[in-house]
Amino acid sequence: MEMTSTQRLILANQYRLMGLLDPTNTQKYQRLEAIVKGGFGLELKELDKEFSDLSEAECLTVLNTLEMYNALQISYNNLPDKSALTPHRLQFAGYCAVREKKYLNYLRFITSVEGKYQEFMRCEHGCDSQTPMWDKYLKMLDAWRACPHEYHLSMAEIQKILNA
């Protein structure tokens, strides 16, 4: 993380204030203040770990994925015969917390802060799929977009999307 001296001073002062405001974490904030004041490059990278860059296209892909799962659920619920597919197959898996953390963070922002698609936060392990899902969701989105009626899917179309 590159910072000017002024930025470092401001951040160091913020950590000092946080230590005063939150006595239970004083040691943590003192450590962070020392890192920023010292300009220790290796440890400064630590501060950067919580930040992620998510492009507008990536945000839209996450939102489109949630909307696709919404359409899958609506279509499934409207089917007269559901025997060919279990409801578990329609459950949104989330994103890998290790390899896809930025997508998982955005998902949590959308559901928790924005209050949208909250029904998808019922996924297992806090929506940590524990395996990368981004590429799978892209294929599923392509299959979904190829369907003539995105919200009135047949059983065959639902299965085709899930198997993409």
Curated annotation (Swiss-Prot):
Q: Which Pfam families match?
A: YfbU
Name the domain of life this protein comes from: Bacteria
Coiled-coil positions are none
Record family assignment: Belongs to the UPF0304 family.
Protein's UniProt name: UPF0304 protein HSM_1818
Q: Native species of this protein? A: Histophilus somni (strain 2336)
Q: What is the lineage of its organism?
A: Bacteria, Pseudomonadati, Pseudomonadota, Gammaproteobacteria, Pasteurellales
